[in-house]
Amino acid sequence: MLFRSGTLPYSVSIADGLRAELADAGTEVTAADGADLVVLRATDGIGEFGPFRHQDWGTSVQCPLPVHTLQSVENGKYLTLTGEGDTEIEALADTPDGWFVKELWEFEAVSGDGAAEGLAGEPLLLRSNAPHSRKYARIDRATGRLVADAENPADATRFSLEPVTSGIHEASELAASADRVVLVLGNDPHINGRETVDRDGLALPPQQERLLHEVLTANPNVVLVIVSSYPYAIDRAADQVPAILWTSHAGQELGSAVAHVLTGRHNPSGRLPQTWYSGSAVLPAREDYDVIGSGWTYRYSRAAHVYPFGHGLSYATFEYRSPAATVREETPGALTVVADLTLANTSAVPGHEVVQLYARRIAAQDPSADPNPESEAARTLVGFERIHLGAGESRKVTFEVPQERLEQWSAEKSAKLLPAGEYEFEFSRSSTDPAATVRLELS
């Protein structure tokens, strides 16, 4: 959970959630965390520390550089800054936490040419990623302890990260011996997902990309679970993985909730609150705030995407039948569009469907009077309803769309206006998947 969210009273992991859910069926659930087991050793032989479980998290948001965590095998705690002035380094933290995360470490190349990969025998410098520190680690020769007080690389201890076991190899071996694989990827909101900092890209961290590749190679029967604060570019996974489930970081029962969805005990009905694009290269420049001209948001973007805004699946199937729309005049110059259809559950299981209503103007009565001609084809979400239907059940779904949801800003008149013309109303499963449409003339 994020630093503003309080402290969880307990936490159910996805592995433990699956164990509990599948216990009565006698299904064995085994797990590996994908972390490498390593020893941190001074290259001049004056000391070594560990073993640690090493995770490569990709780019940090507090100082945008590749970062790592080192979790002690002995006590399960993370290597963190402690002591007066945060100049001591000890394995005392339960989790990476806080606004300034003191459990993140950079592996800096001794050559000064950027980040080191932590390869066996490769000399590296250990540097705190915490903005208030940014100090290099060294071994205090008098005490033999790790401290973080070196201002420059010349005063820092050179280390090598000596591998004991490979986390990716362990995970791929486990996958090869399994009937089904649940692979969990994503981010930690303390490390690489919070406000104030934009990401440099949409790709998964390189270590997670490698893990995904090796696990899929070992066993293609994979369900990919992404626990994240934001979208990723997962084109390859979408093409190769049979099923993908996304969730936010949720709360203490995250593991139980995921297990209930994967086993079918709970029928999912969530919808994506943002578009998942195919990569950052297809997006406009981050500093370009011309939303319409540059093609930002689901309304104006023509960029290639993996999943559109509003996308989501269910174990149930639904049909959209008999769409209709009428105009109701409330007062002179103010109208309401009443749109309805019949929604039918055509499957053998109960479920929820999120019916989304989008509106777009397809032809102006007077193009010269159009307050915003470049946004003519933009779809706008004007309503949605989450409907529960039993197996074989059907129900009428009605939307009432007030005029202000259809109005556009006129810079010339400094007011919001309803452009007269022909409008299309789409009953959709997502922003790009209309299931039924109706047209109305509005003036």
Task: Kindly label every feature range from the protein language model.
Residues 1-15, 19-25, 32-34, 227-352, ...:
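Secreted, periplasmic, or luminal enzymes acting at the cell surface/secretory milieu
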Residues 140-142, 344, 402, 428-430:
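Beta-strand-rich extracellular modules
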Residues 367-409:
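Intrinsically disordered, low-complexity Pro/Gly/Ser/Thr-rich segments with frequent PxxP/GP/PP motifs
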Residues 65, 332-334, 389-394:
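Solvent-exposed, conformationally flexible loop/turn segments
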Residues 405-422:
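Short glycine/proline/serine/threonine-rich loop/turn segments at secondary-structure transition edges
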Residues 10, 30-85, 103-143, 160-174:
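Extracellular glycan-recognition/adhesion modules and their associated mucin-like linkers
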Residues 32-33, 91, 98-99, 153-239:
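Hydrophobic helix-and-loop "lid/oligomerization" segment in the mid-to-C-terminal part
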